[in-house]
A protein has these predicted regions:
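Class I S-adenosyl-L-methionine-dependent methyltransferase catalytic core
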Residues: 1-184
């Protein structure tokens, strides 16, 4: 895995290896990550990355948030409660020397502490476990999400926009669906 574009283009991320079977780590492939950022930065949604705060829920390796930093995001908060994920995220932040621009929270994504509003949220829960919607609701209830926030939700199937959100786009990449939402 590597950073696709921006100031850290080509930087190799810490290898996941065999990891921990119980950690449910399923890193977003380089191809899907590149396609997601092409859609986000393609002009239809303005520029939801440059200069914004980003929330990376179920961060895993941190690749999505770090890609956003490489492309100009101001700050990323990574959320994951897994031991393996915490090690991968902190290792990748150290590799890119971006600790000053990152916060790593070890908590469940549906039990977030109060936070600063973010302009972009990556939501990448383990597939098929129905964890995405509770995490999205928690992020909104605790101040991480405000009107106009763009959410990129990665799941096994396209997601229906929950109350308080509108669907912007949905795309399939193999067995992965990315649903883009915006808070209303």
């Amino acid at each position: 895995m590597r950073i696709i574009a921006g100031t850290h283009r080509g930087a190799q991320l810490v290898p996941v290896g065999d990891g921990d079977a119980g950690a449910h780590l399923r890193p977003t492939s380089d191809r899907v990550r590149e396609s997601l950022f092409n859609v986000l930065l393609g002009g239809r949604f303005g520029d939801p990355v440059r200069g914004v705060r980003v929330l990376d829920l179920f961060a895993g390796t941190g690749a999505l948030g770090l890609e956003a930093l490489s492309r100009g995001a101001a700050h990323v908060t990574f959320v994951d409660d897994g031991t393996v994920a915490q090690r991968l995220i902190t290792g990748n932040i150290a590799r890119l020397k971006r600790a000053a621009d990152c916060t790593v929270l070890r908590c469940k994504a549906d039990a977030l502490p109060a936070g600063q509003t973010c302009g972009l949220v990556f939501l990448d829960p383990p597939y098929g476990m129905n964890l995405g919607l509770p995490a999205l609701r928690a992020a909104r209830a605790t101040g991480w999400i405000a009107p106009g926030t763009v959410v990129a939700w990665e799941e096994r199937s396209a997601q229906i926009a929950p109350q308080g959100f509108r669907a912007l786009d949905a795309r399939r990449y193999g067995d992965t669906w990315i649903t883009l939402l915006e808070t209303t």
